[in-house]
Structure formats: structure tokens, C-alpha cells
Amino acid sequence: MDNLKVMVVDDESRMRKLVKDFLVKKGFDVIEAENGEEAVDRFFETKDIALIVLDVMMPKMDGWEVCREIRKMSQVPIIMLTAKSDEKDELFETKIF
């Protein structure tokens, strides 16, 4: 049986490594992207991604934009990570779902 594929997207390599190491230990295959544009490209190039772990604040294309692009074609589960603490930011952006 093939392992489930998880895409981890974060512009900080330490954060990607932390999440990747945890997921690999749990038996997942991990695909990495370091910015939003790369994430969208990799998502549509790769078959069968089961979950996306997505940073909100990134260069080129932020996590909310990535989510909007992917939602046009897929309902893959997405976990959003953020260092933002302002509840207004969270509530404003959740309308994309």
C-alpha cells in the first residue's frame, strides 16, 4: 500500500523540516514547496496529494491565494499555519472556504 502524500508549504526551511520530519516518522510521503507559486505548480503536477500544510505568510503568493487557486479545482484538506495572532485576519480570510 502506498503512503499518503502530504505537501508542506513554508518559506522557512526550518519549519518545513520540522513538519516534514514529523510526517515522515508517521509514514507519510512529503512533498515540499518554499513559496506559494511553487506550491500551486507542484500541487497540479503531482497526483494524489491527500493533505496540504500551508503557511499563510509567504513571498510571491501567500497561503490564502494558494488556497483560492487550489479550491478552484480541488477539495483537498488544507491546514493553514500562521504566526498572525489577530483574529480579524483569520475571520476575514476564512470567507474563501
Regions found by a protein language model. Give the residues of each.
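Receiver (REC) domain active-site loop signature in two-component systems and cognate sites
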Residues: 58
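Active-site residues of response regulator receiver
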Residues: 55, 82
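Charged docking surfaces used in two-component/phosphorelay signaling
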Residues: 17-25
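Acidic, metal-coordinating helix/loop segments flanking the phosphotransfer/catalytic sites
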Residues: 32-51
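Short acidic/polar segment at the start of the alpha1 helix of CheY-like receiver
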Residues: 12-16
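Acidic catalytic/metal-coordinating carboxylates
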Residues: 35-38, 62-65, 89
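Conserved phosphotransfer cores of two-component systems
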Residues: 44-47, 69-76
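Non-catalytic signal-transmission and effector/linker regions of two-component phosphorelay proteins
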Residues: 1-7
